[in-house]
Amino acid sequence: MAAALGAGGGAGAGDDDFDQFDKPGAERSWRRRAADEDWDSELEDDLLGEDLLSGKKNQSDLSDEELNDDLLQSDNEEEENFSSQGVTISLNTTSGIVTSFELSDNTNDQSGEQESEYEQGDDELAYHKPEEQELYTQEYPEEGQYEGHDAELTEDQIEYGDEPEEEQLYSDEVLDIEINEPLDEFTDEEYLQAYGGQQGLQVREDCEAEDDLDEITDSQVASETHEGGMETLELQKDIKEESDEEDDDDEESGRLRFKTERKEGTIIRLSDVTRERRNIPETLELSAEAKAALLEFEERERQHKQGRYGSRRGGRRGGSLMCRGMGDQRRDNSERGRMKEHRPALLPTQPSVVAHSPRLIPPPQPQPPPPPPPPPPQQQPIRSLFQQQQLQPLLPLQHPHHPSPPQGVHMPPQIETPRMMLTPPPVTPQQPKNIHINPHFKGTVVTPVQVPLLPVPSQPRPAVGPQRFPGPPEFPQHTPGPVPNSFNQPPRLPLQDQWRAPPPPQERDPFFLGVSGEPRFPSHLFLEQRSPPPPPPPPTLLNSSHPVPTQSPLPFTQPGPAFNQQGQQPVFPRERPVRPALQPPGPVGILHFSQPGSATARPFIPPRQPFLPSPGQPFLPTHAQPNLQGPLHPPLPPPHQPQPQPQQPQQQPQHHQHQPPLQPPLQPPHQPPPQHQPPPQHQPQQHQHHHHLSAPPPPLMPMSQPQFRPHVQTAQPQPSSSRMQCTPHQGLRHNAASQNISKRPMQQMQPTAPRNSNLRELPIAPSHVLEMSGNRCSSTPVAQVKSIVNTSPPCRAVVSSRSSQGNTDAKAKPLSPEAQPKEEAKPEAEFPDEDEETRLYRLKIEEQKRLREEILKQKELRRQQQAGARKKELLERLAQQQQQQQQQQHQPQQQQQQPQQIYGSQTSMEQEELAATPSPTNGNPLLPFPGAQCRQNVKTRLLVKNQDITTASVQPKAVNFVPPGANVQHQGQHLRPLKHLRQLPHKVLQVKPMDMEETPHSPQAARVTSLQGRPQDTKPGVKRTVMHRANSGGGGDGPHVSSKVRVIKLSGGQGGESDGFSHTEGQPQRLPQPPDMRQQPTRKVTLTKGVPQQPQHLPVGPHMYPAIPPGIKSIQGIHPAKKAIMHGRGRGVAGPMGRGRLMPNKQNLRVVECKPQPCVVSVEGLSSSTTDVQLKSLLMSVGPIQSLQMLPQQRKAIAKFKEPAHALAFQQKFHRHMIDLSHINVALIVE
């Protein structure tokens, strides 16, 4: 215990100090890791401490009373601890943190006080040791450290008289606090899941052991001290959870309990975890050893100057975390992963930390003055200091570590949460890993940010300890998913941090030592809360800072709403279990301002955050950083999704601003934060873009569907979530990091979003999104329609722009009066201070969008005209052949298509959901797909003409076919969220203009809702129905396709029916006809691949049903739809814009094939290694061939099938097929 506490508490602090001071870099970090691990898992720390710290610290064991006897003159660990406290007092001058900590400890409970004092004693030992180290640099040997401690023992003993008993009690309590059991179990689980808390500890200890083998012995001792420290944490937890105070009687029994329990679950896991952590740290340890030597001196000096306070605090609470930071930045990176792990570990530890949390909260206030050296950390009370010490040697890393210990402190509340949900441990592993990796690759900066993911909450939490109780609601959210634990906890802290004003200031400064520590943590917390994605921001101090602002508003706006935010954030980041990432609650609030950032955190997240997811851990770390991001968020979303969804109606407008889901409640609070953090938001947005870009992966998958559904719930809220989801879901989703940030921006710049240009614009888009977010929030129908229209078709951008101007203007105008006022009102509400800026940004962005749309429209019109001319020629030449061939081919394909339609209709719901997932998986393809399908749509229009000539059925197919493309575009760009948004405005317009649209609307609305499986809101439901229609191919597609449909109408809907080629002319009609077309596009929206068919099926029901038999539609739909799908997959995947361009070729080919039904197939792009035998076998797999001509010089082959149907089938099957590492382009040649 003493050792554990020495590491975690008094001895732990001493260990930390030793680690940080005695063995400046390696040992101190080594011991701090032990201490942090004590923090993370007291039981594990006991085990680890015994293993690592026993050798390392006899002093730690003194903390356990055994080591204290040896190291300290006193027999009691309490003595050492108390001497530590004496040191603390003596050091209080230097480090008010200790005093503050004592105060906080005392404030919380006697047990808490004892524990805190005990830990303080340990920490003070550590602090004292730093002083002693300064005094007794020669004594840096562990014993020297302890002797140094002894030297100040008089002071410590002076205080010791008062608190030794408390320390003893505390040691007993700590030892007895069986919270350690659950904590240890939890820690074990978390450690195992995360990296194995003790393994992480051992790894850290090992890393530091590498730095100091004798420290390993100390570490083992410290492990005991850790037991003490862990027990102290447990005691604190008991303080918070009085259940374990009963065990105060048996220190040894408590220790045995911890040991046995650790052995039962934690010890084994600890060994496993230790291996894992050792592995991770080993990666970092190479530098760790080298840095250990370098850092030993640097850290000695720094710690002597600042490190003592931070060391002790960090030593005790953030000790191991601090050690990690101190030990090595890389180690910190790995440690950070561990810290995240530890966080789960901390969760177990956090019960005590919870106790500490209150103390920390009081100390933070007292602390700030004492720790002027690390003033920024002051806010994050002791942890801040700890990490500042570490940060000083490894400022970036140490800050992350710093947050980690604070989280450890804050974790206490979260420990309760972890208890509630052991799932967090898995989250932690993901996060730590992500963070681990990101720190490794990105370096210290990333490490700090990533560390904050878990640690950040801690730091805010010390101050926010009590506020954390608002956090408890987050605990449920936290509890919902393991990942949420790491993210949610941070969000919790962020919430509290938000409440705590300090984090916001820190948002900016934090990235560096002082401010960096705390603000950065909040920002990291927020970002990392969002999802693993936050780790990406770490490199960018602004990122974390921006997240902080992003989340700061969150914190300000909602301690309680924070939960909602978290809940809703989960809806997006967690709902689609990213991200986080992420896109986590904290980011949500901020997402308001920097939706892109948050969503990206998310979700840029964490899903860049996920968010993933899921990576998550995207982050998302993504988020997997979203992800954090993805796994992290997904768990939360389930529990909170219900809450967020109800809130989403309110948040619909806000959702555009990123994750308003949380913001409905938060918005009132949020509005003020937005004012304060509008500037941060821009930074956050941009940073979050990066942040989420890397992080969104975590939330990626998780977010996509939930977001779609949330989008369905509220076209706008979900778009924000969609942004988050997009981040994880697609490479776009990573861009979606930005896109998540600005789903609206995506919508506004959707054409851009599919391209990568959106990412670059996103920083602007984010601000504009934030500003436009306000506009689009309320004017979601209008702004989003515009953005949707604009963004929905990258290739269709021109048509979409036209239609978007036509339809969007038509719809936006109808909606505009209502929606735009809302835009202004909500932006004002959401961005009271940013209103003017936001409006300016929005206007600028909108103008840019309009310009882009116009340019895209012009390009699209040219393309369409060219395609139309070509197609007209082809149609004229091949009208007869095409009719005959089409009839022949369509009949067989009808059979194929009809089953496909049935399948599509059956799978429309599934595919809608998949569309979210497929969109992410096919996200890039989808995005390109839209481009390709834009061409397809043009081609479809041409085809529609041909088909109209040939058959009415072609029209529906063409329309459906185009809609799949259009919807695919939507899915690709915004996936469904944009679709939903578009659908929403379209639906409104559709309902008004088209009864038919409305008719499918209601049935599909129900169906969509069922598909969504979420009745989110009546309006969201309607929107959802529209969106879902888009997804399920119902009336919703119409709205969804509004922009695309307009394009489609140009190509298929109107064009097919009346304007075969008057796409431009059709635009005006598109507005009226768009509903019809939209329904058809809806079908195409339904799924990227299956959807196109499915949409046909649906449209047959709602729109095309009366008009044309499904069979006919299937026939035509099969050609265009299949081709579109194939091309979309093949070339469409090639690139968003490239796809579009490629698609014209495909479309031309298609037109050719559809019209003449040629038997000759041209295979281009063959690899030089491809033989005629291989080709012939490919050809023969489809049907009998008449001839095969190889043109190696042209890398081309021309084959003639006996049946045109076989040629078409071959083209559809093998176009963009990879043979010998070469993608072949299969074109039908008309003879």
UniProtKB/Swiss-Prot annotation:
Q: Which GO terms describe its molecular function?
A: lncRNA binding; N6-methyladenosine-containing RNA reader activity; protein-macromolecule adaptor activity; RNA binding
Q: Where is composition skewed (Polar residues) in this entry?
A: 82-108, 713-728, 736-759
Question: Coiled-coil intervals in this record?
Answer: 840-891
Query: List-wise, which residues carry Asymmetric dimethylarginine?
Result: R520
Q: Where in the cell is the protein located?
A: Nucleus; Cytoplasm
Q: Where is the composition biased (Gly residues)?
A: 1-13
Compositional bias, Basic and acidic residues, is annotated for: 20-36, 224-240, 327-344, 820-829
UniProt biased composition (Basic residues): 305-316
Residues bearing Phosphoserine are S41, S243, S271, S792, S816, S1002, S1010, S1032, S1051
Enter cross-link residues for Glycyl lysine isopeptide (Lys-Gly) (interchain with G-Cter in SUMO2).
K1019
Where are stretches of biased composition, namely Pro residues?
Answer: 360-379, 469-483, 531-540, 604-618, 632-647, 661-682
Q: What does this protein do?
A: RNA reader protein, which recognizes and binds specific RNAs, thereby regulating RNA metabolic processes, such as mRNA export, mRNA stability and/or translation. Binds a subset of intronless RNAs containing GC-rich elements, such as NORAD, and promotes their nuclear export by recruiting target RNAs to components of the NXF1-NXT1 RNA export machinery. Specifically recognizes and binds N6-methyladenosine (m6A)-containing mRNAs, promoting their demethylation by ALKBH5.
Which protein is depicted? RNA-binding protein 33
Source organism per entry reads Mus musculus
Gene from which this protein is expressed: Rbm33
